Amino acid sequence: MVEWFVCSRTFKIIMHCDLFPTRIYVEQNFLESEEFDEIKLLVKKDKEYLDVPDFAKKVAMHMETICDDLGVDFQSYDSIQVTETWGNVLNKGDGHPVHTHSNHVFSGVFYLTDGNPTIFMEPRPAADCFSLHYKQDSEWFYGSRVTAPAVPNTLIIFPSWLGHFVMPNRTEEVRKSISFNIILRGRYGQPGSLQECRI
């Protein structure tokens, strides 16, 4: 959708549209306090797979709203599935290098404690060839890196192809979170073409 606006100084009509937008969804207070206290106790070791069906079901329900916002045609898909969840435990000196989540459509992080933020990378390599100085609140729109603070009981969902990392923990406080991957079960690609597949 193209939005039009008038520049107040020159009175010229300028076209404004967001090309190739990347949406990141953030929800604070995702779980009720009792649920949050229970799930915090489950994360004991780094990269340990978790069996949390109630959490996964709630994430899948939120994905329905997100897919609707993105204009995804649900008739092409059978279900939304959280394929795996695992704990992240970052002690002093630990971090996560830049990575993506292969073979999935969406991924996410759920913060159990505060600590270093998740930093998302600009996915277009040439976009930061000329770096301007932006106001702090413009980072989400124009920065080459976007910082998502680690706030306990906050859920962040993002495209799996979006590179992200966490700087090494410089404190004695342990940073804990839960990561997860999501797939839409159903048909992908152009129907009737050699590129069509069913997942």
Region locations from a protein language model:
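Beta-rich strand-turn-strand
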Residues: 154-158, 163, 172
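Catalytic core of non-heme Fe(II) oxygenases with the double-stranded beta-helix
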Residues: 88-157, 184-197
